[in-house]
């Protein structure tokens, strides 16, 4: 069956018939192997959104595509914080296209912060593993099978995407953004010694119970939140694996990084240095 629609100017199909026909021969064998590897695991993807009307249809389509091709059980939880651009209305259309068993809408009335968005999402997650990632297409779902493979190789508590190892990298940033990111990562490595190469990235896979404990312990907001998550994971002796990823600057909308966020980052870094 093909479920399709036209959302936010993008034509979508949840499972194209051509893709299912390709699941023969080597494709079918590969999918069977991945299903066996997945066991009884289920993956909940948390997508906090704010003004992501144009990006949401494509990121959801890509997530559905790569999860369906891999054969892993999954759900996508959209946590919209009262976006004025109609993001929630688009999410409702996506729920109709793909089904309420795959697309779960858990909106909030206003913008309350990333940490509380994760707490809210975890409360509704039915998977034993949780992906966190940006909804603005900066994180490509094609890396999801790599995360799952890495986690199973070492039974890691956390698998973090890294832009600074192997084939990882950043595309679409100007020199200023690259210098800020590299500089922030360099300083945090010196001060905090976290045991991970990319502290400020936000594409990660957690065991659900691990994510719950980390979110409860973290007090930071904004861009420091992701950094504190890794630092606290190290403090609690959680194992951390890494997967090289390519980060691509958002396709639609404006970056939420500004001067206030940079100042907050520096304050948060000093706080973590003093308390860890």
Residue ranges with predicted function:
Residues 54-58, 85-94:
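Acidic helix N-cap motif at the loop->helix transition within catalytic regions
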Residues 52-68:
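Short, well-formed alpha-helical segments that are part of the catalytic scaffolds
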Residues 74-77, 88-124:
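Conserved donor nucleotide-binding strand/loop of the catalytic core
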Residues 106-124, 129, 141-223, 250-260, ...:
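Acceptor/aglycone-binding surface of glycosyltransferases and processive sugar-polymer synthases
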Residues 1-42, 146, 191-194, 217-276:
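Hydrophobic helical membrane-anchoring modules
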Residues 41-47, 56, 63, 74-79, ...:
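Hydrophobic targeting segments
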Residues 80-88, 137:
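A conserved acidic beta->alpha catalytic loop
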């Amino acid at each position: 069956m093909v479920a399709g629609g036209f959302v936010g100017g993008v034509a979508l199909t949840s499972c194209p018939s051509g893709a299912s026909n390709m699941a023969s021969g080597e494709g079918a064998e590969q999918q069977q192997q991945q299903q066996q590897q997945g066991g009884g695991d289920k993956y909940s993807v948390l997508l906090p959104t704010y003004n992501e009307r144009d990006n949401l249809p494509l990121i959801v389509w890509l997530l559905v595509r790569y999860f369906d091709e891999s054969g892993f059980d999954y759900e996508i939880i959209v946590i919209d914080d009262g976006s004025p651009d109609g993001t929630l209305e688009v999410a409702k259309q996506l729920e109709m296209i793909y089904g309420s068993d795959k697309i779960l809408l858990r909106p909030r009335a206003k913008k309350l912060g990333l940490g509380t968005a994760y707490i809210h999402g975890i409360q509704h997650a039915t998977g034993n593993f949780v992906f966190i990632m940006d909804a603005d297409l900066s994180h490509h779902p094609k890396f999801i099978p790599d995360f799952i493979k890495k986690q199973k190789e070492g039974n890691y508590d956390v698998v973090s995407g890294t832009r600074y190892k192997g084939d990882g990298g950043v595309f679409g940033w100007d020199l200023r953004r690259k210098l800020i990111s590299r500089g922030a990562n360099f300083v945090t490595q010196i001060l905090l010694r976290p045991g991970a190469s990319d502290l400020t990235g936000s594409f990660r896979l957690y065991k659900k119970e691990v994510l719950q404990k980390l979110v409860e312990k973290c007090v930071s907001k904004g861009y420091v939140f992701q950094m504190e998550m890794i630092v606290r994971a190290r403090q609690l002796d959680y194992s951390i694996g890494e997967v090289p990823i390519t980060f691509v600057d958002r396709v639609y909308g404006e970056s939420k990084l500004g001067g206030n966020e940079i100042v907050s980052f520096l304050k948060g870094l000093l706080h973590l240095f003093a308390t860890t």
